[in-house]
Design a protein with these regions (language model features):
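Structured catalytic-domain cores with a bias toward divalent-metal coordination
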Residues: 1-144
């Protein structure tokens, strides 16, 4: 399929090329980096509290983190989402509405990561539910 997509894209009309979207909510480093960067630029100093509180949530140690620690990260991630929401006007003015939407979704992905990883026996069900939400988000915010 990938080869077919590459071949198709070589001759596809402008704007009709095929691509993939993705945002991995089972890992956190990329989402943290993006949302912290945008938040810090929009509201200097605002990201530091969350960088510290969510430092445990890193891709290198993901399999060594306890379910209890993930559960404790969920309220912090909820607060981060609220912080991004509170900075919406500043982020939109500085970077645009799509940057705000993506930063907010990165914050949600951090929450989802904690939720999925703390779920143990319900891992697949929780993950699949969040994946369905992510598909809906991309349908709303993507280019096709």
């Amino acid at each position: 399929m990938l080869q077919w997509m590459r071949t198709y894209n070589e001759t596809a009309p402008e704007g009709e090329d095929l691509n993939f979207y993705g945002m991995d909510m089972q890992w956190a480093d990329s989402s943290k980096e993006y949302v912290f960067d945008i938040l810090e630029q929009a509201v200097p100093g605002a990201a530091s509290e969350y960088e510290e509180a969510l430092a445990f949530l890193n891709d290198d140690d993901m399999y060594d983190i306890s379910t209890e620690t993930f559960a404790q990260g969920m309220p912090v991630a909820e607060k981060l989402i609220q912080e991004v929401d509170n900075a919406e006007a500043v982020i939109v003015e500085a970077f645009g509405s799509e940057t705000f939407a993506f930063a907010r979704e990165c914050a949600r992905s951090i929450y989802n990561c904690c939720d999925i990883r703390k779920s143990d026996s319900e891992y697949n069900e929780i993950r699949d539910g969040h994946m369905a939400e992510k598909v809906e988000w991309f349908l709303e915010h993507g280019d096709g």
